[in-house]
Each structure stands twice: as C-alpha cells, then as structure tokens.
Amino acid sequence: MALDKLLENEAQSEIERIRAEARGRAEKIVADARERAQTLLDSRQRLLENQRQAGLVRARSAADLELNAARLTASESGVTQVYQMVEDYLGNVTSAPEYGNILSRLIQEGLQAVPDAEAIEVNPAEMNVARHLVSGVEVRENPSIKGGVRVVARGGKSGVTNTLSGRLERVKADMAPQISRLLAE
C-alpha cells in the first residue's frame, strides 16, 4: 500500500503541478488579453478624442467662416450704403452754389485732356452756367451728361467725359477697403 500511496501522492503532486502550471498559463493568457484589450481601448479612446478635437476644430472653423461672411456682408452693405449716399449727394450737387466752381474745373480738365475740342456737352439744366464758363468752344446740350461735361473732338469721334459720378466709379474699388475699415471702427 505504501507504493500505492506513494504513486497516488506522486500523481497528486504531478496533477497539482500541472494545475498550477495551467493556472499560471491561464493567468498569463488572461493578463495578456487584458493588456491587449486595454491597449485597444486606449487606442480607440485616443482615436475618438482626436476625432472629437478635429470636429471641434471644424466647427470653430465653420463658425469663423460664417462670422467672417457675415462681417463681409455687413461691410459690403455698409459700403453700398455709403456709395448710395455719395451718389445721392452728387445727384443734388448741381443745385449747390459752389457747383459753378466744380463745373469750371471739370471743363478745364476736359479741355486739357482734349486740346483740339470742338464742343462741350453738358446737361440741359447746366447750359447757362456752362456758357458763362466757356469761351471759344461750342456748348451743347446732352441730357445723358449729369454732374459734369463731355468734351468732344473730331466730329464726335473722340472725346472725354468728365463727370462726378464717373470719377466716383473710377475710385470705388480703391476706396472700398478704406470705407470698410472706417465703418468697422
């Protein structure tokens, strides 16, 4: 019986050793699986956080773009209103007392640009003022001219139009940034 007992003890020891070894391997497998799961979880969390941050950046960028678009629209609207006010003023400037001086300068500049001028065309409402300002050149009515003159040469084939509204049109693009800046202040 002692041999049986000895064999049984030895078998029991071997079983315990195998069980312990299996438990150790199982614990290692579980630990490795937990580590891989944690690594995967951390990786997914980083990915989600990066996606969240990217979404926030996109949302901020979209909001900034929308804000800038609104500012630009407001600025353009303000510039348009300023130009409309100036055009309204220029439309009424012909009735101002100082308009004779303005028309005189417009005529002089036109004559300098076209030295061989045959005629000066002005709006019919400005004929009397223009006749007093011009000598040596025919003064004609031209209803399409408003707030200025058209100096004509070579039978009307060449000439220059010098009006206040024309001058405004020429400087609009250059003045828009300055007007926008002033409106923003």
Curated annotation (Swiss-Prot):
GO molecular function: ATP binding; proton-transporting ATP synthase activity, rotational mechanism; proton-transporting ATPase activity, rotational mechanism
SUPFAM superfamilies, sorted: V-type ATPase subunit E-like
Presence of the UniProt keyword Protein biosynthesis in the record: no
GO biological process: proton motive force-driven plasma membrane ATP synthesis
Keywords: ATP synthesis, Hydrogen ion transport, Ion transport, Transport
Domain of life: Bacteria
Family classification: Belongs to the V-ATPase E subunit family.
Name of the protein this chain belongs to: V-type ATP synthase subunit E
Organism: Deinococcus radiodurans (strain ATCC 13939 / DSM 20539 / JCM 16871 / CCUG 27074 / LMG 4051 / NBRC 15346 / NCIMB 9279 / VKM B-1422 / R1)
